[in-house]
């Protein structure tokens, strides 16, 4: 393969929500620094915002304060959060919202010029073009270089510091070596670990981006970064088949969750995110399904508004209504839970970070869905974390410069030597060797294992330790098969690394599920060996570090705030 070495001050891996905003922040505060964004897709329509959104779900509305949002997120996660992270995120929500509007995002306003709210924490937007707005702002920065269609596979470490990363072009046989003084991981969460709602050709009709494979998680795990709360999986309550969001209906028109008998069941089980999922699963198990959002009988105008609202983010739901011949006010909307995802924007799973968004690896920072401890980020929270991480990078680089500390970057000779090794690693996948399985077969087998033995849809999100032991054994067997996978082109090479990434994340998920010996979130998974909650787990984070080929479990006190500073990795 052809190899290219690119040097910068800051490398941002992932050009999604937080990655873009981090680049903007650095460009505005220090336009002399050279920033490179390595993006797997194309920055214009990449990441979770690719299809657009119709609301900003994290905003401090009139009469509320940031501490209220912290309380809400803490209760929703049943206490397993880092309040320091939640507070610093909440304090920036309205600031980044104002910046988005300044960049061109249309935020709906009432006759008095105030934002139109949707519930206590949301505001309505016309957000089909939210990602292009961010991307164009980034592309306008002279000191920011965006390299699209590059899949990053590993970090580069020198002198116990992350000094870059390497990857390959997904369209051409080019290997990239990125050297940087600071690296921000903003690669998003992990989808595709479990068997999805829809089979075959429609398997990517899912809640979370199917192209978010957990790459940032996997790189961090293998590099020895401390991870947190992978057992807190996210399961979304969605419109059946289309997997379209339900919040637009529930909050937009006040639709209640009802069973097949027409009974409102949400008050019976609770109204936190996971309780809404649990109630739906329980009603179906007890023979009172299907379950619905009760929209039949709403005003005709409200029905028309719903048809329009879904065009901004999930047009398939609008098409389903149209094809049925009935509008939203003429029929209820059937709902279901999705397969589990690992996503730090909704749960507390991800890198273990300090309040400045430093990871336990020196020189490496994390923001957005890849960062743990701070659930309920949504779009604006991811923006804030990108901003915080960027400002920390600026501060740390300035301290290094003033203290004349060693930057820890590899020399030209070291980079050239690394380039040869990377080329050999990738080229080995193109070698002719006998492989009985392809990436798609291994991925399907992985999803079947996770569904059956690690609490997927097929078991109503239930699992026990015996099942998890089986899952661990089978995932190890599947990972061993990946060494024989071969590629005809870079697209095949991409799929090889994606399935490897998912398998690494699966191993961590299984280890975390085994470690939390209670059922903290019934809707996100029930440990049938430990079906209740335990008081001694109320302030305990389940963390892990990959050492000598094994996942080592650590327990951290959530009330203690870590500070990794310039040293990295110390509590």
Q: Language-model features: where?
A:
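Conserved redox-cofactor binding core of oxidoreductases
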Residues: 45, 96-182, 186, 190-197, ...
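FAD-site-proximal beta/loop scaffold in flavoenzymes
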Residues: 154-171, 177, 329-371
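An anion/pyrophosphate-binding glycine-rich loop and adjacent beta-alpha core
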Residues: 219, 225-335, 340, 383, ...
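N-terminal Rossmann-like FAD-binding beta1-loop-alpha1 element of flavoenzymes
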Residues: 10-37
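Short, well-ordered coil/turn residues at beta-beta hairpins
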Residues: 14, 180-182, 186-187, 367-368, ...
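Glycine- and aromatic-enriched mobile tails/lids
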Residues: 1, 5-8, 22-25, 29, ...
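Conserved N-terminal glycine-rich FAD pyrophosphate-binding loop of Rossmann-like flavoproteins
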Residues: 41-71, 247-249
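Glycine-rich loop(s) and the adjacent beta-strand/alpha-helix scaffold that form part
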Residues: 185-244, 379-392
């Amino acid at each position: 393969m052809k190899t290219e070495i690119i040097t910068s001050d800051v490398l941002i891996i992932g050009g999604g929500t937080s990655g873009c905003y981090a680049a903007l922040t650095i460009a505005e505060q220090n336009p002399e620094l050279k920033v490179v964004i390595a993006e797997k897709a194309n920055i214009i329509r990449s990441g979770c915002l690719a299809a657009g959104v119709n609301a900003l779900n994290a905003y401090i509305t009139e009469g509320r304060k940031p501490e209220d949002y912290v309380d809400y997120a803490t209760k929703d996660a049943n206490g397993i959060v880092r309040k320091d992270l939640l507070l610093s995120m909440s304090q920036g929500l309205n600031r980044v919202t104002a910046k988005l509007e300044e960049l061109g995002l249309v935020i709906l306003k009432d006759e008095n010029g105030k934002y139109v709210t949707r519930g206590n924490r949301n505001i309505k937007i016309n957000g089909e073009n939210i990602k292009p707005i961010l991307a164009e702002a980034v592309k306008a920065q002279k000191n920011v270089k965006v390299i699209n269609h590059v899949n990053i596979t590993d970090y580069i470490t020198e002198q116990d510091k992350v000094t870059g990363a390497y990857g390959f072009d997904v369209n051409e046989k080019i290997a990239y070596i990125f050297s940087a003084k600071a690296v921000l991981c903003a690669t998003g969460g992990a989808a595709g670990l479990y068997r999805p709602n829809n089979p075959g050709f429609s398997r990517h009709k899912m809640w979370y981006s199917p192209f978010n494979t957990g790459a940032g998680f996997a790189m961090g795990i293998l590099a020895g970064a401390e991870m947190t709360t992978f057992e807190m999986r996210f399961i979304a309550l969605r419109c059946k088949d289309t997997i379209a969001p339900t919040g637009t209906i529930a909050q937009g028109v006040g639709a209640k969750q009802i069973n097949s008998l027409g009974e409102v069941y949400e008050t019976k089980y609770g109204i936190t995110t996971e309780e809404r999922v649990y109630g739906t699963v329980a009603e179906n198990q007890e023979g009172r399904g299907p379950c619905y959002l009760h929209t039949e009988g709403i005003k005709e105008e409200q029905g028309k508004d719903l048809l329009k609202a879904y065009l901004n983010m999930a047009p398939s739901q609008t098409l389903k209504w149209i094809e049925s011949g009935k509008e939203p006010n003429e029929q209820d909307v059937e709902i279901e839970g999705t397969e589990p995802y690992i996503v730090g924007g909704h749960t507390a799973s991800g890198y273990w970070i300090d309040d400045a968004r430093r990871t336990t690896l020196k020189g490496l920072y994390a923001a957005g869905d890849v960062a743990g401890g701070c659930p309920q980020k949504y779009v604006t929270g991811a923006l804030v974390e990108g901003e915080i991480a960027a400002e920390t990078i600026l501060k740390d680089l300035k301290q290094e410069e003033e203290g004349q500390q060693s930057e820890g970057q590899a020399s030209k000779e070291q980079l050239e030597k690394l380039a040869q090794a990377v080329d050999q690693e990738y080229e080995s996948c193109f070698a002719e060797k006998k492989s009985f399985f392809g990436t798609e077969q291994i991925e399907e087998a992985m999803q079947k294992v996770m569904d059956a033995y690690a609490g997927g849809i097929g078991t109503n999100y239930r699992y026990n330790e015996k099942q998890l032991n089986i899952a661990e054994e089978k995932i190890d067997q599947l990972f061993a098969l990946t060494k024989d996978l071969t590629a005809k082109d870079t697209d095949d090479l991409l799929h090889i690394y994606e399935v490897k990434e998912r398998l690494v994340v699966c191993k961590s998920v299984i280890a975390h599920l085994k470690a939390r010996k209670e059922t903290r979130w019934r809707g996100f998974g029930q440990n049938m060996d430990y079906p209740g909650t335990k008081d001694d787990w109320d302030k305990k984070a389940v963390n892990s570090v990959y050492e000598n080929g094994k996942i080592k479990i650590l327990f951290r006190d959530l009330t203690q705030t870590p500070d990794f500073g310039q040293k990295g990795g110390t509590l």
